[in-house]
Amino acid sequence: EIPVSYPSLSEQKSIAAILTSFDDKIELLQAQNKTLEELAQTIFKEWFAKYKVGDKLPDGWGVGKLSEFGKIICGKTPSKSNEDYFGNDIPFIKIPDMHNKVFILETTDNLSIEGAKSQNNKMLPKNSICISCIATVGLVSITTKKSQTNQQINSIIPNENYFREFLYFTLTKMKNYLNDLGSGGTATLNVNTSTFSNIELVKPKEDIIKDFHKLSNPIFEKVLQNNTQIQTLTKTRDALLPKLMSGEIRVKK
């Protein structure tokens, strides 16, 4: 038999209490984010969602193409034959990085400075809005730092900072429409950059978009703050667990 050491029962209970405190805090922040996102979405629906392209619009409102709200960028993957193009410098966003995330805090892959410079025209600044447009269509997320994406993602760099929340919710509610646009009689959904750029949407008066930004921006910033805290708590908990179980870190009984 191989002897196995393990913490005493009282120490196991202390370890469980520590880990539970992390889980409870994470769940609390996740619940808070859900409430905050629903609040911002409710305000958006009340202000904007009742109007569609083709409807009679309020005075001063109109219809504009998506490209009128910002610069459209289609992502690209650097040559994989050059290993120097990949590293830990620039987040490289792919569709799995976007699932159920308002903000993209981390990515599974990253580019080197050299790799990013090889396609510098694909660089996205912070607060760009990414939309998945091939295969899995209609996911919408916001960048939190300078990033690039692969070719399955179209992004918009808003012309004005106060467009961010309006564009996020406008694009989020277009999921079914984007799926219809991308069907094209093929098995794989694909909304190409030209089609994406020419999507028409209701264009409210700019001062109304600004007012919505004033209300929703603090909500989005709180969601981002909570997400950052969740990320830190999760990494700390996961790093602590093996050390607690191995006895490398001991807790008082």
For the regions a protein language model found, what residue spans apply to each?
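DNA target-recognition domains and sequence-specific DNA-contacting regions of bacterial/archaeal
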Residues: 1-6, 58, 62-204
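Non-catalytic DNA-recognition/assembly elements of restriction-modification systems
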Residues: 3-77, 92, 96, 202, ...
